């Protein structure tokens, strides 16, 4: 559910803004001066919407649009080709997304894991950035509805809205420069806030826009999504090169650094994980970076519980008579004292008979090699057994190595460890450096990639009121005018394509919202 406090703040804030605006406009003393102030500053206020427009940046836009004319011509030609391809590809992408959503709705147990754009999704900002790289732990769709407070953590709103605003500004800069390049008058640039979503816009002289050729219009209309696509590519490049960029201050490849442990995490405790710990192994799985951490947890979660070699003498010394019984899930329990330190283990004796024994977990698994069967233990000692923790179906005992501290023994679902422990691959070279800085940068870049890419895809959809509508109209004018002489037929074709795109997008948004809010 959306946090009530967030709703109260948003609704309360807009109520104050709107009532203040209404009172000032109704006041005999302040009406004219207030309206003059709004007009002079390019401000307009309506319910849940604030809009600011300025001509301050016009000179900069004209400078950019008239510089290196030949290069810009080729640049926006590439953008035009990309825009047309993206417009038609969006049908396939939306159709695929709709099928995925319907498949999830039909499933008995829809996947409970979702991301941002790219996202990415977890309980804290740093865990989101570090864990979103694991595709195996998530059944992600290319497009997904994002609702703050539901599948977008409230503590990541700053990343989200900053990335939305930057993506919107870059999008509109593309339209503005392309328009000036095609000799369309540029009136101004602006920013708006709708409820909680920020955005940008450019004001172009409509008459000029209608007088230029369809191909010129295409360059202008495609420029926005083209710039968003390029921004997403630059974000991917920055993400790949981040270890190199931060190399003078941070190093990687030796493990993962703990940046945060949630208060409700099972990893909290005197012998648990702490901020600043360097994890090098999960069981016998080496961890050198975030991807290794995710893959190791994935393997541990979906493979049978691993065992530990123990000598016959140690087993005899530590074990004591117990009465085993079956749990509801069919697994066996043999520790009847509900101890936090003892765990029920199963093993096969020399006669291949399965036995159960209750052992102090730390003494049983410390300084031992891992195994699957007794044969794995015979290599080191002929009188050894492979003892395997007898736990509930989805529960695992995981030995987490974080030297120089003593190994942490974690008992629980691997995904709980995944979602309640925040990590980073970047280890500071100097003590004064923040361990959170690389995580903040990484998280923001991932949001920028996801949201800029999403803005390019969604705006390319031939849908009423989106860039795709104008791209489609210009494309039909450029290609069908000489083929179909009757403009009414051409307009009818365009209308049905727009109707199909609008219905497809609306279906995705509606079902996506239902899937997000119904979970």
UniProtKB/Swiss-Prot annotation:
Changing residue 467 to N: Loss of activity. GO terms for molecular function: metal ion binding; metalloendopeptidase activity; transcription regulator activator activity. Its cofactor is Zn(2+). One of its GO terms (biological process) is positive regulation of cholesterol biosynthetic process. It is a multi-pass membrane protein. CDD domains: cpPDZ_MBTPS2-like, S2P-M50_PDZ_SREBP. One of its GO terms (cellular component) is cytoplasm. The active site is at residue 172. Expressed in heart, brain, placenta, lung, liver, muscle, kidney and pancreas. Its main location: membrane. Glycans are attached at residue 337. Keywords: Cholesterol metabolism, Cytoplasm, Disease variant, Glycoprotein, Golgi apparatus, Hydrolase, Ichthyosis, Lipid metabolism, Membrane, Metal-binding, Metalloprotease, Osteogenesis imperfecta, Palmoplantar keratoderma, Protease, Steroid metabolism, Sterol metabolism, Transmembrane, Transmembrane helix, Zinc. Zn(2+) binds at residues 171, 175. SUPFAM superfamilies: PDZ domain-like (SSF50156). It is found in: Membrane; Cytoplasm; Golgi apparatus membrane. It is an enzyme of class 3 (hydrolase). Residues 25-74, 108-144, 252-446, 477-492 are lumenal. Changing residue 227 to L: In IFAP1; does not affect subcellular localization; impairs activity. Residues 1-3, 514-519 are cytoplasmic. Residues 115-135 are annotated as: Disordered. Belongs to the peptidase M50A family. This is Membrane-bound transcription factor site-2 protease. It comes from Homo sapiens (Human).
């Amino acid at each position: 559910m959306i946090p009530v406090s967030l709703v109260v703040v948003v609704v309360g804030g807009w109520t104050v803004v709107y009532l203040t605006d209404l009172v000032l406009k109704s006041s005999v003393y302040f009406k004219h001066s207030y309206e003059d102030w709004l007009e002079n500053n390019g401000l307009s206020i309506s319910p849940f919407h604030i809009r600011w427009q300025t001509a301050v940046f016009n000179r900069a836009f004209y400078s950019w649009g008239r510089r290196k004319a030949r290069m810009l011509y080729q640049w926006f030609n590439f953008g035009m080709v990309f825009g047309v391809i993206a417009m038609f590809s969006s049908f396939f992408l939306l159709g695929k997304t709709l099928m995925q959503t319907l498949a999830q709705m039909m499933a008995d147990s829809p996947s409970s894991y979702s991301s941002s754009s790219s996202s990415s999704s977890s309980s804290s900002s740093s865990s989101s950035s570090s864990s979103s790289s694991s595709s195996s732990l998530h059944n992600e769709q290319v497009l997904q509805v994002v609702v703050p407070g539901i599948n977008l953590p409230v503590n990541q709103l700053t990343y989200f809205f900053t990335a939305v605003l930057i993506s919107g500004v870059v999008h509109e800069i593309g339209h503005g420069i392309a328009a000036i390049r095609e000799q369309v008058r540029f009136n101004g640039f602006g920013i708006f806030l709708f409820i909680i979503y920020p955005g940008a816009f450019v004001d172009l002289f409509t008459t000029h826009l209608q007088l230029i050729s369809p191909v010129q219009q295409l360059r202008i209309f495609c420029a926005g999504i083209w710039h968003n696509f390029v921004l997403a590519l630059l974000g991917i490049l920055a993400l790949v090169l981040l270890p190199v960029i931060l190399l003078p201050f941070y190093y990687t490849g030796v493990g993962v650094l703990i940046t945060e442990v949630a208060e409700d995490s099972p990893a909290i405790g005197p012998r648990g994980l702490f901020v600043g710990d360097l994890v090098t192994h999960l069981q016998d799985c080496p961890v050198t970076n975030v991807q290794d951490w995710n893959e190791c947890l994935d393997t541990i979660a979906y493979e049978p519980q691993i065992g530990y070699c123990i000598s016959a003498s140690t087993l005899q010394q530590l074990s004591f008579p117990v009465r085993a019984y079956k749990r509801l899930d069919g697994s066996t329990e043999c520790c009847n004292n509900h101890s936090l330190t003892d765990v029920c283990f199963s093993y096969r004796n020399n006669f291949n008979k399965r036995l159960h024994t209750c052992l102090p977990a730390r003494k049983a698994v410390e300084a031992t090699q891992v195994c699957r069967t007794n044969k794995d233990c015979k290599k080191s000692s002929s009188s050894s057994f492979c003892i395997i923790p007898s736990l509930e179906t989805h529960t695992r005992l995981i030995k987490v190595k974080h030297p120089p501290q003593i190994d942490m023994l974690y008992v629980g679902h691997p995904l709980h460890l995944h979602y309640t422990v925040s990590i980073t691959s970047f280890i500071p070279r100097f003590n004064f450096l923040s361990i959170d800085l690389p995580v903040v940068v990484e998280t923001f870049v991932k949001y920028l990639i996801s949201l800029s890419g999403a803005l390019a895809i969604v705006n390319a959809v031939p849908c009423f009121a989106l860039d795709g509508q104008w791209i489609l109209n210009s494309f039909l004018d450029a290609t069908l005018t000489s083929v179909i002489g009757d403009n009414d037929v051409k307009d009818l074709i365009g209308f049905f394509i727009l109707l199909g795109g609008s219905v497809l997008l609306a279906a995705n948004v509606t079902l996506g919202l239902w899937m997000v809010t119904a979970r």
